[in-house]
C-alpha cells in the first residue's frame, strides 16, 4: 500500500479528512513534531538545510549576473551611469501587441526589457566589474559554489559525515569560528578585494587574473606596513575633482578616514570603506579568539552568564541558568538571531540612502525608493518572527526549575507591569498624535490653516546640530565654530563629514519640521502597539488569568472544548497573527513618510511635504492620491505605456488584499456549510461526479482561515505598495 502524505506523521497520514493535507503542509517544517525525531537528528536536519539555503542564494545571485550579462546593457551603462537605464532582463513575450513592445523597448536596446531597480549595476560597478565577461565569470563561479553547497548539504546527512549533538552544543567553538572565520576573515578578504581590485579600477587601472600579482595597490607595497608607517597608506587620497573610473584627480591612498561623499558619485569614498572593513575584520578576528576551547584559556560563556548577578540583588539570580536554556532551545536561538537580523536589516534600509556606498546609486531615485521599502518590509517580517519563536520557546522549551528566580523567570513574574506600561505608552501616543492630526484637519477644512498646532522637533534638531548641521543655529558640538570637536573633525578625522551634512545634495540628516514631528510620533505609536501585542503574546504564551494552563494546548489552538468559550484570540499564535497587521501598518507609515519626503526633495518641492504632512487629508490627497495618477492611467482606451505593468499589479494587489477579508471576517461554520454545498453540487454534476476523492472534506479551522486571510492581506498589501512606489517614482524621474 502506498503511504499517504505526510510521511513524517503516521497519525496525520491516517486521518480520513482533508485535514490530512492542510495539517501536513502546516507541520512540514515543524521538525520537532515529526515521528521518530531525536534531538540529534533535528540538529542534523537543520544544519544540512543551511547548505541548501546557501545554494539557493548563490543560484539566485548567479541568475542575476547571467541575465544581465546576456540580456542587459551593463557595458553601455558603465559609460554613462546617470543617463542609461540599467536592464534586468529581456521580456520574452510582451502581451498586448505592438504598443507593449514599443513601451518596453528602452535602455538603448532593440527588444522589450525590464529595468533593474535593485541597484546591482551600481554594486558591480563599484566593486570593480566593467565588462559582461566579468559578470559571466561571477555567474559561473557562483553556480559552481551553489553545486558545492548542495553536495555539502547531502554529505552532512550521510552517517559518516553527520556531526554529533556535542558538536552542535559546543558554543565557544562555534562563536570563535563564526566571529573569526565568518565575520573577521571575510571582512578582511572584502577589504583586500576593495584595495586590490575596486580602488585601482576606480582610478582607471584594470586589475585582472592576468596582472593582479604584478600591480601594487599602493606605491610602497607592504614596506609601510612592516616599518610601522601606516599613515602612508592614508596619504594622497583622491581629490574632490576625481572622475570615478579614470586617473583624473586620483590619488594613491588605500585606507583613509575622509568622511562625506565622493563629489561626483555622491557615494562614500572607496578608501574609507576599505578602511572600515579592515578595522571591522581585525576586531572580529580578535573577538574570535576570546572563548575557551581546547587549551583552557579564554572566556567560558557559562561562567560569564552564571556570574552575571546585579550586586544590589534586585535581579535575583541574574543570568544563572540562561546558558543551558539557550543552548537547549533552538527556538530561543532562532528568536535571538531573527531579532538581531531584523534590527540590522532596518539599519541597512536607513544607511543605504543616508550613506550610500555604491557609485551613482544616490541619483537613481527609483532604486533608492525600492531598496528602502524592500529592506524595511523584510525587517518587519524578521522582527515578528523573533517574537513568534520566543513564544514557541515559552510553550515548548522553557523549564521553570532551570530558570528559578533568574531574569527570565522574573520577567514572567512581572509581566503585568511590562504589558500595562506598553499599553499606557501606546494609548498616550495614539490619543495625542491623532488628536493633533485631527485638530489640524479640522482647522484646515474650515479654511484657517494658521490655527494648526505645529510643534517644532527641537530635540531632534538639537541632535542633528550636535552632529554638525548648522542650519538650526544651535551652536553645539560639531556645529559650534569654537568647539574642540569641530576643529578635530575638520582637521584630524572625517574632514568631509561637515561638508556632507550641510550639503543639499544628499539625504544625510534631512531638515525636519512639524510634519516630521507628527509622523515620528505616529510611527512611535505603531511600533509600541506592535511591540505590545508581540510581548503580551510571548509573555502570556504559558498561561494567563483567563487560561492558566495555556502551555498544555500548544502554540496555536482553536477555541477549545466545553467551558473554554472566548479562547479564540488568546493563543500565542493569535498574538503573532494580530501583530502582523500592526507590523504592516507600521512599515506602511514608515515607507509613506520616507517616500513622500524624498519625492518632494528630489523634485525640488520640499515645501509640499512640509505644508501638507501636518494633517491627515494632506497625506491622503497630496501623497497617496496625487502620486497614484501613473497607476490609474497606466492603461486606458488610448493604449498603454511602460508603467502599465505596475498599474495592473496595483489593481491585482488590491484584489488579493480584499480577498483576505473574506477569510478574516468569516469563521469556521461558514466554510463548512460552503464546502458541503460545493460537495453536494459536485456529486450531482455530470462529468464532475466521475472525479471522486477519498478524503472527507472538512472546512478550514479558525486558525487556518486566519492564516489564509493574513497571507492574502499581506501579499496584496505589499504588491499594491510596491507597484505604487516604483510607478509613482519612475513616472516622475524616468
Swiss-Prot record:
| Organism from which the protein derives | Guillardia theta
EC class name: oxidoreductase
Tell me what topology the record assigns in the membrane: Multi-pass membrane protein
Residue numbers binding [4Fe-4S] cluster: 559, 568
Task: Give the intrachain disulfide bonds.
Answer: none
**Residues binding chlorophyll a B1, per UniProt:** 654
Name of the featured protein: Photosystem I P700 chlorophyll a apoprotein A2
Where, by residue number, does chlorophyll a B3 bind?
662, 670
Summarize the subunit comment: The PsaA/B heterodimer binds the P700 chlorophyll special pair and subsequent electron acceptors. PSI consists of a core antenna complex that captures photons, and an electron transfer chain that converts photonic excitation into a charge separation. The eukaryotic PSI reaction center is composed of at least 11 subunits.
Q: Does the keyword Lipid metabolism apply?
A: no
What is a single molecular function from GO for this protein? magnesium ion binding
Q: Which InterPro entries match?
A: PSI_PsaA/B (IPR001280), PSI_PsaA/B_CS (IPR020586), PSI_PsaA/B_sf (IPR036408), PSI_PsaB (IPR006244)
Which Gene3D superfamilies does this entry report, sorted A to Z?
A: Photosystem I PsaA/PsaB
HAMAP family per the UniProt record, alphabetical:
PSI_PsaB
Catalytic activity reads: reduced [plastocyanin] + hnu + oxidized [2Fe-2S]-[ferredoxin] = oxidized [plastocyanin] + reduced [2Fe-2S]-[ferredoxin]
Q: Where are the transmembrane segments?
A: 46-69, 135-158, 175-199, 273-291, 330-353, 369-395, 417-439, 517-535, 575-596, 643-665, 707-727
**Pfam families xref list:** PsaA_PsaB
GO annotations of cellular component type = chloroplast thylakoid membrane; photosystem I
Entry coiled-coil feature ranges: none
General function of this protein:
PsaA and PsaB bind P700, the primary electron donor of photosystem I (PSI), as well as the electron acceptors A0, A1 and FX. PSI is a plastocyanin/cytochrome c6-ferredoxin oxidoreductase, converting photonic excitation into a charge separation, which transfers an electron from the donor P700 chlorophyll pair to the spectroscopically characterized acceptors A0, A1, FX, FA and FB in turn. Oxidized P700 is reduced on the lumenal side of the thylakoid membrane by plastocyanin or cytochrome c6.
What does the note accompanying the cofactor annotation read? P700 is a chlorophyll a/chlorophyll a' dimer, A0 is one or more chlorophyll a, A1 is one or both phylloquinones and FX is a shared 4Fe-4S iron-sulfur center.
GO BP annotations listed:
photosynthesis
Per UniProt, phylloquinone binds at 671
Amino acid at each position: 500500500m502506498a503511504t499517504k502524505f505526510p510521511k513524517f506523521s503516521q497519525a496525520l497520514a491516517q486521518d480520513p479528512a482533508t485535514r490530512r493535507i492542510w495539517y501536513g503542509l502546516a507541520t512540514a517544517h515543524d521538525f520537532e513534531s515529526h515521528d521518530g525525531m531525536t534531538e540529534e537528528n533535528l540538529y542534523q536536519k537543520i544544519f544540512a538545510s543551511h547548505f541548501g539555503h546557501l545554494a539557493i542564494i548563490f543560484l539566485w545571485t548567479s541568475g542575476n549576473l547571467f541575465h544581465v550579462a546576456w540580456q542587459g546593457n551593463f557595458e553601455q551603462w558603465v559609460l554613462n551611469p546617470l543617463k542609461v537605464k540599467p536592464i534586468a532582463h529581456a521580456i520574452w513575450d510582451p502581451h498586448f501587441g505592438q504598443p507593449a513592445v514599443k513601451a518596453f523597448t528602452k535602455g538603448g536596446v532593440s527588444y522589450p526589457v525590464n529595468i533593474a531597480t535593485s541597484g546591482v549595476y551600481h554594486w558591480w560597478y563599484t566593486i570593480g566589474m566593467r565588462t559582461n565577461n566579468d559578470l559571466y565569470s561571477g555567474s559561473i563561479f557562483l553556480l559552481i559554489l551553489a553545486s558545492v553547497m548542495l553536495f555539502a548539504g547531502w554529505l552532512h546527512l550521510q552517517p559518516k559525515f553527520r556531526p554529533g549533538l556535542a558538536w552542535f552544543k559546543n558554543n565557544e567553538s562555534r562563536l570563535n569560528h563564526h566571529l573569526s572565520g565568518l565575520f573577521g576573515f571575510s571582512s578582511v578578504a572584502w577589504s583586500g578585494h576593495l584595495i586590490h581590485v575596486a580602488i585601482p579600477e576606480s582610478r582607471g587601472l584594470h586589475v585582472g587574473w592576468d596582472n593582479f600579482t604584478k600591480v601594487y595597490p599602493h606605491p610602497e607595497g607592504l614596506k609601510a606596513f612592516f616599518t610601522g608607517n601606516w599613515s602612508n597608506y592614508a596619504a594622497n587620497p583622491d581629490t574632490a575633482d576625481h572622475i570615478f573610473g579614470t586617473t583624473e584627480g586620483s590619488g594613491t591612498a588605500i585606507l583613509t578616514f575622509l568622511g562625506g561623499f565622493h563629489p561626483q558619485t555622491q557615494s562614500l569614498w572607496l578608501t574609507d570603506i576599505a578602511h572600515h572593513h579592515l578595522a571591522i575584520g581585525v576586531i572580529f578576528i580578535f573577538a574570535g579568539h576570546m572563548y575557551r576551547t581546547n587549551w583552557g584559556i579564554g572566556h567560558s560563556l557559562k561562567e560569564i552568564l552564571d556570574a552575571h548577578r546585579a550586586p544590589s540583588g534586585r535581579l535575583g539570580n541574574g543570568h544563572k541558568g540562561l546558558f543551558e536554556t539557550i543552548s537547549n532551545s533552538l527556538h530561543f536561538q532562532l528568536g535571538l538571531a531573527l531579532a538581531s537580523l531584523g534590527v540590522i536589516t532596518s539599519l541597512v534600509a536607513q544607511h543605504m540612502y543616508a550613506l550610500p556606498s555604491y557609485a551613482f546609486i544616490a541619483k537613481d531615485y527609483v532604486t533608492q525608493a525600492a531598496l528602502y521599502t524592500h529592506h524595511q518590509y523584510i525587517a518587519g517580517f524578521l522582527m515578528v518572527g523573533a517574537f513568534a519563536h520566543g513564544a514557541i520557546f515559552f510553550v515548548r522549551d522553557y523549564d521553570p526549575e532551570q530558570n528559578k528566580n533568574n531574569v527570565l523567570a522574573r520577567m514572567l513574574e512581572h509581566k503585568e507591569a511590562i504589558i500595562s506600561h506598553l499599553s499606557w505608552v501606546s494609548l498616550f501616543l495614539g490619543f495625542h498624535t491623532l488628536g493633533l492630526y485631527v485638530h489640524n484637519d479640522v482647522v484646515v477644512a474650515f479654511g484657517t490653516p494658521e490655527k494648526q498646532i505645529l510643534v517644532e522637533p527641537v530635540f531632534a534638531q538639537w541632535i542633528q546640530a550636535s552632529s554638525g548641521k548648522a542650519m538650526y543655529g544651535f551652536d553645539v558640538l560639531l556645529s559650534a565654530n569654537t568647539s574642540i570637536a569641530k576643529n578635530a573633525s575638520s582637521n584630524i578625522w572625517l574632514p568631509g563629514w561637515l561638508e556632507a551634512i550641510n550639503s543639499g545634495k544628499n539625504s544625510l540628516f534631512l531638515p525636519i519640521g512639524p510634519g516630521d514631528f507628527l509622523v515620528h510620533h505616529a510611527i512611535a505609536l505603531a511600533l509600541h502597539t506592535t511591540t505590545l501585542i508581540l510581548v503580551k503574546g510571548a509573555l502570556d504564551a504559558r498561561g494567563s488569568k483567563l487560561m492558566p494552563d495555556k502551555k498544555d494546548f500548544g502554540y496555536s489552538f482553536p477555541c477549545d472544548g466545553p467551558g473554554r468559550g472566548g479562547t479564540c484570540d488568546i493563543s500565542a499564535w493569535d498574538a503573532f497573527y494580530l501583530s502582523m497587521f500592526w507590523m504592516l501598518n507600521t512599515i506602511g507609515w514608515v515607507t509613506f513618510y520616507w517616500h513622500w519626503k524624498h519625492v518632494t526633495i528630489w523634485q525640488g518641492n520640499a515645501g509640499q511635504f512640509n505644508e501638507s504632512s501636518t494633517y491627515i487629508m494632506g497625506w491622503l490627497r497630496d501623497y497617496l492620491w496625487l502620486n497614484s495618477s501613473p497607476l490609474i492611467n497606466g492603461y486606458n482606451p488610448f493604449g498603454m505605456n511602460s508603467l502599465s505593468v505596475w498599474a495592473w499589479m496595483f489593481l491585482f494587489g488590491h484584489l488579493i488584499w480584499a480577498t483576505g477579508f473574506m477569510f478574516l471576517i468569516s469563521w469556521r461554520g461558514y466554510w463548512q456549510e460552503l464546502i458541503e454545498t460545493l460537495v453536494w453540487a459536485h456529486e450531482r454534476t455530470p462529468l464532475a461526479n466521475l472525479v471522486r476523492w477519498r478524503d472527507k472534506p472538512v472546512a478550514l479551522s479558525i486558525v487556518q482561515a486566519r492564516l489564509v486571510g493574513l497571507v492574502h492581506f499581506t501579499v496584496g498589501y505589499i504588491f499594491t505598495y510596491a507597484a505604487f512606489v516604483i510607478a509613482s517614482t519612475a513616472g516622475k524621474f524616468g
